[in-house]
Amino acid sequence: VSLPFLFEIGVEEIPDWMIPDALENLRVLFEKLEIPYESVTLDATPRRLVLRAEGLPARQADSQERVLGPAKSAPAQAVEGFARKQGVKPENLAVEATPKGDYYSFIRKVPGRLTKDILAETLAGIILQIYFPKTMYWTGKGGPRFIRPIRWIVAMLGDQIVPFELAGVRSGALTSGHRRLGAKEIAVTPADYVQRLRDHYVVLSAEERRNRIRDGLAGVRLKPDPALLETLVYLTEYPTPIVGSFDPQFLELPEEVLVTVMRHHQKYFSVEDAQGKLAPQFATVMNIDADPEGFVRRGNERVLRARFNDARFFWETDQKKKLANRLPDLAHVTFQAKLGSYRDKTKRIMALVKELGGKALAVRAARLCKCDLTTELVKEFTDLQGVVGGLYARAQGERAEVWQAIYDHYKPESMEDAIPRNLAGRYVSLADKLDTLRGCFRVGMIPTGSRDPFALRRAAQGVVRIIVEGKLDVSLDALLAPDASKHAQPPAPGPRPPAPEPPAPAPPPPAPGPRPPAPGLRPPAPEPPAPAPPPPAPGPWPPAPGPRPPDPLRDFLADRVRFYFKDHRGFQYDEVNAAMAAGWSNLVDLEARLVRIRTLRATPDFEPLAASFKRIRNILVQAGFTGGGAIRQSLLEPGPELELYQEFTQIAGQPIESVISKLRPKVDLFFDKVLVNAPDASVRQNRLTLLHTLLAEFSTMADFSEIVTNS
């Protein structure tokens, strides 16, 4: 028998942004029950989370269970007791070999349980396991926790109620309609559930609510805002769009201010005229069926007028004091308790901008970029920080490069957002984000899987995007090793031991292009009479100048670099790993090498040569060979070995793209005909040196052994 299943959790209004993730979490928890079903549908409104499934069996399938009994060597009495417990005769028992010896065993049939009973035992636990960033007690401390108080639960398998209780709420077949327009109690079944809700002014489907809003505003030129649309979908159960207007005199305020007031504080869409300019209108959604007398529309207009009047007052009042004169006020605005004030942060940003190579205008923008935090407009509308500073700077006569840099310095705020439009803005934004990252990691505020209060992941992703997309030739190794005193708290009275000296900045990797021959390759010369030294002790490949100390910030940023190039730019994961293994301090250089790798990968010689490089690496690691000494020509045997050496001397220093077709057949022939681990120690050493030199030559572009090949 195939049965429909209806499960509804009725609650007080859930925050709109939590609903989609909660639904997906509910799906996962239901699937973990491993109850067969044909299809499952999840829906939600602010007051309910709903799972509907079709095709559940009335009873689970029978199964078998292996029961292990006494050892074969056990007394007959023990064997008979085990058989009696299983309801069979001793001769019906099987003997099974185990790691501990031979044991009697029995395969017994386990009847399938009623699906209704399984659901009754598990649904309460599923409700409490749904993840929300914050939860609350509503029955007293120590009781169940959920995002909002649970008011009713519907749980039905076919036409039968699945009985259970949670926090005093018993499951049943009664749901609730719209808070104002519908009945408080509505009897439902899985078959009529959706229509019964619709009869009581609840549109269950989010897609249907979305279309209802779109269709109702089809004749209005809205400023595109998909995120606001999603917010309104999950704020309402019966959305009905309305359009209002405001005094055109408010259009004298900057558009950014008006749009922010409407969008972030009132959940209104902005409306554009035929020329694409802001019109004195707005659109919003009410959670009722109609507004025939216009009461709701006029109420929204009245609220918006008050908001706009506040914004105009703040705009005019703030401009009586220049941004530069607000700089001392930043000393009273705390950035973070352990990292000082925003005045301290401003000084660090200015120093970093200079370190990055920013000129006078960039330093000027860095000096003023945080001053708008002391303005009344930003205190009231915090989403406008940065933007307001740029607008005030423009109104106060700052040059375009300065005010645009201030305006843009919080960008990019998402992967879809653009980076700052000019070089000064990129320097200021990069310095601001780097300062936040360095400071927070220095005082131990490192993001976890569920907590990132300072949005450090977004800051790190912004660092990567600004450097790569802004083509900034900077060394991250140098920027990630700042003077510790820059983020230290003010010293306490009395002597303090000096801070350790910072490590020297690492030089950026060489730009793509011709390079001098790799170490170990020399022109023909008289050979030393001394025999080749024995191979050095085993060590890592490629050889490193020394172990890098643990650096959580560097590792954190490396993850963001991988994410950017793999998920955002579409490079293969092994391409990213290969290029980063050769160095990633200079992200512009890393991008160029990744483009070259992707181009090379399309050639027929690439994968076989990459497989050969992997083979070379494995040989060197197994031999414990880390380089040293020159290639001795007198020890090279005529044939494939000498030909590989001669080919290499001709192509050394050239980009791999131009030589791959010549190099690959020589490498293949070498491995087919030459025994690397020759019995003669000198010959073996010389062949390892040849392979090491060959691999090192091309490892400045990538560690090709990281490439996954079909070979």
List where the protein language model places each region.
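Amphipathic alpha-helical "coupling" segments that flank catalytic cores
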Residues: 1-516, 521-711
